[in-house]
Design a protein with these regions (language model features):
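Carbohydrate-associated surface elements
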Residues: 145, 167, 227
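Conserved donor-binding/catalytic core segment of Leloir-type glycosyltransferases
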Residues: 184-200, 206-209, 222-224
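Nucleotide-activated donor-binding/catalytic signature segment of Leloir-type glycosyltransferases, i.e.
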Residues: 234-262, 266
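Short hydrophobic beta-strand element within catalytic cores of glycosyltransferases
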Residues: 297-298, 302-305
Length: 758
């Protein structure tokens, strides 16, 4: 039997990785059925690791196409079954949704180990975990509480769930030899190990120590573990520094040792064998599985713990002691009692040792092997496959290389000669606003550090170009001279769009506060916008703002007023055969229905919704032909009752169509819009009137469009940003298409929108 495993894997420092490696090797080394293993390892934040030979492929957590390449590899590998190690945070997308397309394409039985099960999940988390359980042949959990949650909260059939305890290494050291090695002969060792973060409650133990040392001055508390990588990424060593200050203030330097190390299991078990009492002082009950608790009991430690779920379940029948959350006084009483009564301490250690003998990895691995043998012996009932309207494998790898080429410390250069920045043309507000939108989307979806690096560059350009009255200049020369006093209404609207998106998706408070300042300084100008595209862009920005600030009734009123202006333009210009806002189809056409679709979602207005869908259908009729997109040419546009221009075709028009169909899909869940979205995107890659790709696979930029003679090879900011925003939108739509319908829209909301269209 050949098995595939999906999860993190050493040398990546991660508890799930250690679990995956131990499980895989224990099943292989048992020699009872498993003859070959292969691992698909999860990488984080573009990190590469020197994996051992059993790792055949790695997945970049935020790269959706990696998941599809991995499932193709698994399906062709000859593996008989797949084991998925599921933990929130190791799979990409909102709530870890990127794993779903892989599971939907998997052609072999799936066994999923759930390391975390949330009692109060978000809508996304609940729906995604339910879908994973639906796709799994068996689900392994490590506590009875987990079974209760799965059945009661996630509605998983109980017969699908199997309880297999967390495994522990079958490693043993002589206690006295270990104490001698660590020079602990005269000390009473208290120990906590694992990744460090504020939720671990280390300060509870430190605050309890003065009362313990008063009676047991030989006590030593060792905290063994690095700061959790996610904590380190966002807060640095803030928590460890806080602990060090606390230790110093309580004069505990001789009694507390913080070891900032991630050690191997042999070394860890030496510490566990040497310790007198193991402590898990976690601050929250919401931990359904604790690998550190299992390891401590497997090593025969006397465990003292707060009553989080796993501890409350395991530390019964004198296998340990419990104390209340954040209760330093209670902890000191328990520890003093045990240190003063060695016979009680020894009795707990004996019970823990007895339990630990049943959860060694060889025994746990055999349970998994037996489970898979049972699954393979039964005929697999195929689940219905979802139609894959979007194929991410057709997309080039997402890259910011050309954007980096165009960006300096002032902003993004607006034009290019072929793939080289044209410094003579300087900068413009339009493109820096588009660039801000794009990097916000990129960081939200891919956590790309380069996007985070560029974000303040584009935001500071926008701030610099704002006038005292809240309007904006547009053009800036390369030597930083202003070239106009007031920019176009289009550029104003695009800036509000980007700022509105930022306010709902800012990666930190500094960028949020800057964006908020610029946004609200511009608000007094909203009522004076005349151009319909300036209005549309502004409406989109307001809609994004309102999604996270729904109580701002004044801004809702402004959005309604602007939407009514577009609706009024529609009523003034439409005829039986011309369902549009003007007497011509010009440029960036899709943003007009797009703006109304956004407003329809936020305002729940039937008149706005009807005009949005009617005009979208009209635009579709005149731009979708023979299953590809043909955007309106800008030579003479398409004037009512005249011939439409075929050239020049520009990327911003295709981008607007992608965004328009995406918002229609979000509102309705109608997969026909998903198909049209992908068709519109493929315009960039050669499914167009010229049958030529505008995307340059060498420079990673996008050409400026089609002329009647062929491709305009210049690759300016507008075109490349239009491509990247479209690319990100396709990936977002693909992600949404694999979420349950209830994630995208409730049945009631879908029904309401359908009624609004009627």
């Amino acid at each position: 039997m050949k098995l595939a495993y999906i999860g993190t894997y050493p040398p990546r420092e991660c508890g799930i990785g250690t679990f995956t490696q131990n499980l895989a090797h224990s099943m292989l080394e048992n020699g009872k059925g498993v003859k070959e293993i292969m691992v698909i390892a999860m990488n984080d934040h573009n990190q590469d690791y020197p994996y051992p030979p059993e790792v055949k492929l790695s997945i970049n957590q935020e790269q959706q196409t990696d998941y599809l390449e991995a499932v193709n590899y698994i399906n062709l590998s000859g593996a008989d079954a797949c084991i998925l190690e599921h933990e929130f945070g190791i799979y990409g997308g909102l709530g870890g949704v990127y794993i779903l397309p892989l599971l939907h394409r998997l052609n072999i039985p799936l066994i999923t180990t759930l390391h975390t099960i949330l009692e109060t999940p978000s809508y996304n988390e609940r729906a995604i975990l339910k879908e994973i359980c639906k796709m799994s042949d068996k689900i392994v959990v490590m506590s009875h509480k987990a079974i209760h949650f799965l059945v009661g909260i996630y509605k998983v059939p109980k017969e699908k769930i199997v309880l297999i305890e967390h495994g522990v290494p079958d490693i043993h050291f002589d206690k006295e030899e270990s104490r001698t090695e660590f020079k602990l002969n005269e000390r009473k060792l208290l120990l906590t190990f694992g990744f460090i973060g504020r939720n671990k409650g280390i300060e509870t133990v430190i605050k309890a120590l003065p009362q313990i040392i008063e009676k047991h001055p030989e006590a030593l508390y060792i905290v063994l573990g690095k700061t959790h990588p996610n904590v380190l990424r966002h807060s640095g060593e803030e928590y460890r520094n806080y602990l060090q200050v606390l230790i110093k203030s309580l004069k505990l330097n001789e009694h507390v040792l913080l070891l900032n190390e991630f050690i191997d299991e042999n070394e860890l078990f030496k510490y566990l064998s040497a310790c007198d009492i193991y402590i898990t002082p976690y601050l929250s009950e919401a931990q359904i599985t604790s690998g550190t608790l299992s390891y401590a009991m497997g090593a025969g430690c006397a465990v003292v713990s707060t009553p989080y779920w796993h501890a409350a379940e395991l530390l019964v029948e004198n296998k340990g002691r419990l104390f209340d959350f954040n209760d330093s006084d209670g902890l000191s009483e328990v520890l003093n009692e045990l240190l003063e009564n060695p016979e009680n301490l020894h009795e707990i250690q004996e019970h823990a040792t007895e339990y630990g003998q049943d959860i060694t990895w060889p025994k746990v691995g055999q349970k998994y092997t037996d489970l898979i043998t049972q699954v393979l012996s039964r005929p697999k009932v195929p689940l219905p496959k979802k139609e894959n309207v979007i194929d991410p494998l057709l997309l080039p790898p997402f890259s910011l290389v050309h954007i980096k080429r165009l960006t300096d410390d002032t902003g993004i250069i607006q034009h290019a000669k072929f793939g080289i920045p044209n410094l003579k043309e300087g900068y413009c507000l339009d493109d820096n606003a588009r660039a801000l939108l794009m990097v916000c989307m990129t960081y939200k979806q891919k956590k790309d550090p380069l996007a985070l690096e560029f974000m303040p560059v584009y935001l500071s350009y926008i701030h610099y170009m704002q006038n005292k009255d809240g309007t904006f200049r547009n053009f800036l020369s390369f030597n930083r001279n202003f070239l106009d006093e007031k920019g176009s209404e289009d550029s104003f609207g695009r800036t509000i769009w980007a700022l509105g998106y930022l306010l709902g998706n800012a990666p930190n408070d500094a960028y949020y506060q800057t964006g908020k300042l610029v946004f609200f300084d511009a608000v007094p100008n909203f009522d004076s916008i005349k151009s319909i595209r300036g209005i549309a862009n502004t409406m989109i920005g307001i809609s994004y703002y309102l999604r996270t600030n729904a109580s701002d009734d004044a801004m809702k009123g402004t959005l309604h007023k602007l939407a009514n202006i577009l609706v009024s333009h529609y009523h003034q210009n439409h005829t039986e055969n011309w369902e549009w806002f003007e007497s011509l189809l010009a440029y960036d056409n899709g943003i007009l229905p797009l703006a109304l679709l956004h407003a329809a979602e936020v305002l729940e207005d039937g008149d706005i919704s009807k005009v949005a869908f009617d005009t979208m259908d009209f635009l579709t009729e005149h731009t979708m032909k023979d299953d590809y997109l043909s955007v309106i040419g800008n030579k003479d546009w398409y004037v009512r009752e005249k011939e439409r221009s075929m050239f020049a075709q520009q990327p911003i028009d295709a981008e607007a169509m992608v965004l328009m169909y995406h918002q229609a899909y979000v509102l309705t869940g109608d997969r026909d819009f998903l198909k049209k979205l992908f068709t519109s995107f493929m315009w960039f890659l050669g499914e167009n009137d010229m049958r030529m790709s505008l995307y340059d696979f060498e420079t990673k930029g996008c050409c400026d469009g089609f002329e009647n003679y062929g491709v305009n090879r210049n690759q300016g900011a507008e075109s490349s940003l239009a491509y990247l925003i479209s690319h990100l939108t396709v990936l977002q739509a693909y992600e949404e298409s694999f979420q349950l319908e209830e994630i995208k829209t409730s049945k009631a909301k879908k029904s309401t929108i359908n009624e609004l269209q009627d």
